[in-house]
Structure formats: structure tokens, C-alpha cells
Amino acid sequence: MSLIDQAREQMAKTVENTKENFSGIRTGRANPALLNGITVDYYGAPTPIKAVASIGVPEPRTLSVTPFDASQAGAVEKALRNSDLGVSPNRDGNVIRLTMPELTEERRKEYVKLAKGKAEDGKVAVRNIRRKTKEALDKAVKDGEMGEDEGDRLLKDLDKVTKSVTDEIDALLESKQKEIMEV
């Protein structure tokens, strides 16, 4: 596998990571990914909520959480109540409902700022991958493993890949901003 292919693969993982980070940012709509960071004290062991309960979206602004083990409904409710989501869980038997409140303009702007920060983190990671790959290319040229023309051509390819990936991150950010600001 060439250096450029390795860089492309690492950058693709960075884009996926950025998408995952974006999915955890609240918008006006309910999204099961909002609960990804929440852990439940499941028989004494911290366990991700999606491993102990099914999460559904019955209405655009409501999440329903149904524990697989009915005896753990209290622990799941407690984990949701102690989370930083800013919503109060309503328990109805074994089903726990979370109603997402409308976001204020101020909160929307905070979330846009957060999204911009996560996008910038992704771009920094891409630039670091580019830098490391360029260093490896320069070393290969210096050590005589490839000619200067080959090194220059690969560097241009690397720059094209880097540009396309940063453009993709920008497009993801723009899409997320629209989603957040949508009332």
C-alpha cells in the first residue's frame, strides 16, 4: 500500500470520526446518537446505554428508551437524569421517554460554535496526517527509494486528497449548522 493510500485511509477515518462527533451535538430533533456517551451502572459495571436498552424515535422531538431487562429501568432512568443532556426522563412502566425541548437562539449558536470546534479538530487531524506523510515522502526521496519527480507527483496527489477531505469536512459542518439553526 502506497503512502498516499495509507494517508487517504487515515483521512477517511478522520472524516468518520468527525461525523460521529457531529451526531452527538443536539439539534431541534431527537437523535439516538445523543445518548452515545451515556453509561448505565448495570449490575455494578458501567455499560453503554445502547447495550442495555433499545432506543427509538416515536416522534420528531421524543426519544423512547426501553431497557432489555425490566429490572434495570431505574438504573437507566438514573443515568439519563444524571447526564448532561438537559432533559428530564419520564418513566412509564418500563419505557422511559425523553422529550427534547426547543432550542433557544442562544443555545443554537453555542451548538454551532461546538460544531465548528469539532470540524476544526478534524481538519487539524487531517493536516497532521498530511505532514507525517510528507515527511515520509521526503525521507524516501532523500534515501533514494524514489526519484524527485516521483516524490513531487505523490506530493501533488497528497495535496489533492487533503483538499478534498477538508472540503468534505467543511460540507459536513455546513450541513450540521443548517440542521442546528433550523427551527
Swiss-Prot record:
Protein name, as recorded: Ribosome-recycling factor
Cellular location(s): Cytoplasm
Keywords linked to the UniProt accession: Cytoplasm, Protein biosynthesis
Main location: cytoplasm
UniProt similarity note: Belongs to the RRF family.
Taxonomic classification: Bacteria, Bacillati, Actinomycetota, Actinomycetes, Bifidobacteriales
GO biological process, one term: translational termination
A GO term, aspect molecular function: ribosomal large subunit binding
Function description: Responsible for the release of ribosomes from messenger RNA at the termination of protein biosynthesis. May increase the efficiency of translation by recycling ribosomes from one round of translation to another.
GO cellular component: cytoplasm
